[in-house]
Amino acid sequence: MRKLLVIAALLALVAVSVTAGIWYNKLVKNPTQEYAYAKGVDAAAYSFPYFLNSVLLNKWSKPPVEGMAFTPSAAVNQFWHLSEMPSAEDYRDGGGPNLDTLYSVAFIYVGEEPIVMSVPPVPDERYYTFEIAGFDSDNFAYIGKRTHGNLGGNYAIVPPGWGGVLPADVQQLAEAPTPWIIVVGRTLIDPNNPDDLQAVNALQAQYRITHLPDWGIDNPPLPPHPPLDGLGALLDPYLADGAPKLIRKVALQDPMLFWQVVNWALDGNGVPARDQSRLPDWATLELGPGQDLSTLDDDTREGLSQSVMQGIRILQSYSDSSLNPGRRINGWRYPAVHMGRSGVSGHYLNRSAMQSMK
């Protein structure tokens, strides 16, 4: 009897082994490719803001183009101002413009020295705001009527750990979490009053960005920044495309370009201390600061290529999925309480899908 039980157990073990082998062969055809795909989907969802902001930085750094009056240009270390009211068709780089404010936007480099943002006195009845975000899209500072009043002022954004002394007429606003930051300003306008346009344009002309070493001199030069040639070499072929169209093209036609751009952004902006634990896994795929995608084998490259589309699909479907902590009440969507600083709160899908993609 014991022999029969032993034989039965051995036969069962063989059957399980054979079944497991068949199951494994069907599901895992190429472990290297599968690993790159699985890790890549997560990395794509995490790093999407770095990709999108690189696209915008490259596009917005270019000189003005005729017929593109509603697309920011020459907006590095100086403000580009929307000088007239747009329509939904006029802006093609994602999101939807307000219809009662005019925008003032800039990418600013704060990697070595502080910069000073200057805001003039603003009439009491006029709302204005400047949202300031790191390259990962998380807001870290704000200037506006509700927090700073309407008297105007000079506000310094400094590199991390900067220990210098500011002039008496400059107040420190915040430390920049990344060397490259984004400023989006809005100034209230009455769309039904044609005369109000001139008043808002006059205010916009007084919004200034100054390199601290040049503070106090007349007609200071633009603050310096690292060259963007490497980024342009990657993205200039797509300059004619709005950001949503560019994302589709890259995902479908050249997904490894996504990772090249992400690596460029991470080289220049790093990964926050709270997320450093991701880097060892990424390094096995040549993703992250200082990594070299050209050394990848074909299987890893194929897995990473496939992961880009899936990562973007997850972000596109996130808004209406159970993953979204926001709520719908009476037809209105209420965003998650950490909206605007989702990455700081550890909600990376929300950061990518709602803060960046939407």
Briefly describe each language-model feature range.
Residues M1-G21:
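N-terminal Sec-pathway targeting helices
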Residues A20-K358:
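A compositional/structural signature for long, glycine/proline-rich flexible linkers
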